[in-house]
Every structure is written in C-alpha cells, then in structure tokens.
Curated annotation (Swiss-Prot):
Statement: the UniProt record of this protein carries the keyword Kinase: no
SUBUNIT field: Homodimer.
Protein's name according to its UniProt entry: Nucleoid-associated protein CE0210
Family annotation (Pfam families): YbaB_DNA_bd (PF02575)
GO molecular function: DNA binding
Main localization of the protein described in the UniProt heading: cytoplasm
UniProt entry tagged with the keyword Lipid metabolism: no
Disulfide bonds: none
Keywords assigned by UniProt, alphabetized: Cytoplasm, DNA-binding
Subcellular location: Cytoplasm, Nucleoid
GO CC aspect terms: bacterial nucleoid; cytosol
Family recorded in the similarity comment: Belongs to the YbaB/EbfC family.
Function field: Binds to DNA and alters its conformation. May be involved in regulation of gene expression, nucleoid organization and DNA protection.
Length: 107
C-alpha cells in the first residue's frame, strides 16, 4: 500500500481554503432583501447579517394597528435572514462536501 502524496494533499487543502475564503468574501459582499405583505415592508440585509435598510409603504401604517406593522417588519427581517442563510448554503455547501460535512447549520 502506497503512502498518500503529502504535497498533493497540501495543495488540495490550500485550494479548498482559497475557495472557501472566496465564497466567504462573496457572501459578505452580497445583499439580500426580505419582504412581507408582497413588498409593502422590506428589510435589506448584508451578507454579514447587518440590516442596512428598512422600507415601509405608508399604506401599512395605521396608528390604531401598530401590531400588524410590527408583525410585518418582523416577517421581512426573518425573510431577509433566511435569504442570507440560503445564500451562505448555496456558496459554502459545495465546499463543505470536501470537509465531509454540512456547514449550512453554521449560518
């Protein structure tokens, strides 16, 4: 039985590390928009999870029904958060196979 070629293994590990770093940078440079009520409330979130904008259509602002607006903002935030997680899984998932595991649960 022959020993594995350590230089080849090291080269593969370095290549995977470079791909992983590129995927991480792509995720961090990305932006997603979560929405609720067919876009009447939107939350823009960076790939790092930072909320960069919240837009609320005046049609959903009712001073007598603040709870609905709160629910819509929360729904838009959760939608944006899910989209960031989906983006991370899309970019990192194929790379995680090389590590023998699913990294999607990290995001």
């Amino acid at each position: 039985m022959t020993q594995p070629d350590m230089s080849q293994i090291l080269a593969q590990a370095q290549q995977m590390q470079a791909q992983l770093q590129a995927a991480q940078q792509e995720i961090l440079a990305s932006s997603v928009v979560g929405d609720a009520a067919n876009g009447l409330v939107t939350v823009t979130m960076s790939g790092s999870g930072e909320v960069t904008a919240v837009n609320i259509d005046p049609k959903v602002v009712d001073p007598e029904d603040v709870e609905t607006l709160q629910d819509l903002v929360q729904g838009a935030f959760l939608d944006a958060h899910k989209k960031v997680a989906d983006l991370a899984q899309e970019k990192m998932g194929p790379l995680s196979q090389g590590f023998g595991g699913d990294m999607g649960s990290l995001f």
